[in-house]
Amino acid sequence: MSRIGKLPIEIPKGVKISYTDSNLQVVGPKGTLSRTIMSGVTIEMTENHISVSRDDDGIKSRSAHGLTRTLINNMVTGVTKGFETALEINGVGYRAELKGDVLNLSLGYSHPINFSLPKGINVEVDKMTKILVKGVDKELVGQTAAKIRDFRGPEPYKGKGVKYADETILRKAGKTGKK
């Protein structure tokens, strides 16, 4: 039995969950999420708990058991609290600006980068060097933050580029020069 998969998921007040034909829909105060549940996994719902169990001990069922429980837990957390990821921009002339649902980035290239935000993602820009990506879907928040970081990842010599707020960059020593 999966250690993570056997834990029940508590349903907070204000969250409604419907499960029909392997489709799970979670509705909460911050929004709605839906996901198709993998085969080999069964979901049992009570008034305030959801439990996930597997149909057999096959490899696919065992691997999907804990994953399914975690995905459902992330859906419940997303519609109640939401998820956010913070990014920082370091470098001379590097800045971010939000215009509508387009994030304009100046990252040292000869052209500005215009990044259209996906549906369901909100971005806040503070002091043109801090970006906060918010949303209900944990996977989409993380993917959007990773795409923004990929435009110019931090380089190891001066640390210029876009990095996660809690990320530490391993710095390299520069050339030592001939004496």
From Swiss-Prot:
One of its GO terms (biological process) is cytoplasmic translation. This protein binds to the 23S rRNA, and is important in its secondary structure. It is located near the subunit interface in the base of the L7/L12 stalk, and near the tRNA binding site of the peptidyltransferase center. It comes from the Bacteria. GO terms for cellular component: cytosolic large ribosomal subunit. Gene3D superfamilies: Ribosomal protein L6, alpha-beta domain. Part of the 50S ribosomal subunit. One of its GO terms (molecular function) is rRNA binding. Pfam families: Ribosomal_L6. The gene is rplF. PROSITE patterns: RIBOSOMAL_L6_1 (PS00525). Keywords: Ribonucleoprotein, Ribosomal protein, RNA-binding, rRNA-binding. The keyword rRNA-binding applies. Belongs to the universal ribosomal protein uL6 family. This is Large ribosomal subunit protein uL6. The keyword Secreted does not apply. InterPro entries: Ribosomal_uL6-like, Ribosomal_uL6-like_a/b-dom_sf, Ribosomal_uL6_a/b-dom, Ribosomal_uL6_bac-type, Ribosomal_uL6_CS.
